[in-house]
Structure formats: C-alpha cells, structure tokens
Amino acid sequence: MSTPTSPTPKTAEVPARQPWPRGRRRTVALAVGTLVAASGLVSAAGYEAYHASTPSPAVTHHEKADGTTVIIPAASQNPIPLHGRIDTVDYQQEYQGVTYKKQALVYVPATYVQGVPANIAYLTHGWMSSAEEMADEVSPAIDDLERSGALSPTIVVFATYYPDRSFVNDDFETDYQLNRFFATSEINTLIDTIESRYSTYADGDTTDESLKASRTHRAFGGFSMGGITAWDVFALNPDYFYGYMPMAGESWIGRDHDAPLPQIADEVTLGVRSRGMGPQDFRIIASVGSDDPALDDMNPQLGEFYRRYPTLMTSQSLQVWIDEGGTHSLASVSRQ
C-alpha cells in the first residue's frame, strides 16, 4: 500500500521502474479523505496534516449489553468506543444459480443524519480474508478523521466477494472469478441494498440515472485481490464511481489472454474512454508497500498507463502512494 507524496508521478517519460512517492500514512483513511476532497468537500491538505500528527491506534473489541460490538482504541488509558457505529446489513446474492445470504458491515459516522446525504465508499478485502477483518483494521482510522472534523460525513461499507466461506481455498488465483463477478454484478446489488437504506447523494433512488448523477460522492477500493477488484470496477463499471483505491493489487484485465502492457492499458481505460470521460471525471489512488511483492506487479502497469495515456492518466487522476517499509498486510493498509 502506499502513501501520498505531493503529485509526483510523471505523465509521459516514465522509467522502467517509477520512483513513486514514499512515506507513512494511513492509506485507506487518507485515500477516502482525498477522494472526498477531490469533490471539493474537504481539504486534502487538512487530511495530510491530521495524519502526520496522529498515531495509528491499536484496537480491542468490547461487547455491549445489547449484544452489539464496538471497536475501542487500546492505546488510550481511557478507551473510547467508536465515535460512529458499525451496522450489519443483510442481503441476498445469486451466484451460479444459488442464492446466498450475505452480510456487509457499514461504518456510520456519528455526524450522519438520516435524510442528509453522506458520501460513501465501498471496500473489499484480499485472499482468504473477510469484511470483518478489514473493518477492524480500517474503522478506527476513519473514525479518527470523523471525530476530528477532518472528514465530511462518509459511510464506509466493508463487503466480501466470497459467496460464503466454502469458497475460500489455498489458490488465490481462483478468487478472480469472484472478483470479476463482484465488480460487475454484486456491487450493483450491494449499492441497491445500502443506498436505499442510508441517506447518500443518490437520495434513496438507485436507478441507473440517479447513481450516475451521484457518482462524484461514491468510491470503491480494496486490498490485494480486493485491489484487483477495484481495477475491474474502474475498467468495467465506471458509471457509478468517481474514486478508486486499488491497494497492493495490479489489474488482472487481459490476464486470461496474456495481454501485453499496451493492451492492458487499452483495456483498463476503455470504460472511461468509451464514455468520453476525461481526467477530471475520476481519481485513482493506487497504493502499495515498498517491501510488498505486489509493487513489482503494479509498477510496470502504472508506468504504462502514464506513458500510453498521458492526458487521461495524469498526476491528478492517477496517484501512486508508497508506504516505505510496508509489506503485503492489512497492518500496512491501516498504517498508510
């Protein structure tokens, strides 16, 4: 995963190995903030100043009398529950002729008011992981931003691409079929379920027209295989999202036919190009740890995106953040 450094990714003359910006910040929280800032709702500089001065908390869990669970920063002498809350939302998804009962975890900020639209971000995990694990790592960082007032009201949805846990196995490559399905089909089910329940800029209307009109207030991200999912969403389903956060994952578009880098760049950008979108119509924050093997997979693609489409993939529309010393782990995600 990565961290932002001022816009330094180059657009045209990109060396074989790009010297991406490096540092240590909490990627997911800051990325959500930056994507929100890109819509003019909050200052990105404010996010960076906040994160530079705020340590990443350890967390513990406490079950309340009513059976709900709160996540508590363990580092504090007087632990305080999340300022916001975590809801569990049930939905059903059909996959290969079978209907599965699924759950998503929804971080709802304390600043949320029913009837007042909030921004929304959808996040998914990596191989063998779960929505619960990602929520545990990321929610405290998001909550810190909400509590400080640095983040405009933003709902964060943690979802799994596994129909159920029987799909988890020791071959991560088999996940890609599920990643593709989630990016092109299940995400639509999830949006319909979540945004008909919570107040977002879709205003309860999950028709195609409404979701397109409210896309600047919606982002999608993921870690590892979830990052690969994020690239699929950008390539194949860009109508509903403005922001994308692929963390420690390159695009697998074209993998089934061993596409060379120029063709991968063509296929990844085809969705926005075919819709007449320009660099002002999306923001990608691609992040990875400096000690993560995924960096070597992402680096050639990112360089090719800048090279082949310099007026589309600019230093603003495609940002690359590197977490110095970061590995392929959720700990790196939360730290960045």
Briefly describe each language-model feature range.
Residues M1-R25:
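Terminal targeting segments of Actinobacterial cell-envelope proteins
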Residues A29-G33, A38-Q336:
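Non-catalytic cap/lid and distal C-terminal segments of serine-dependent acyl enzymes
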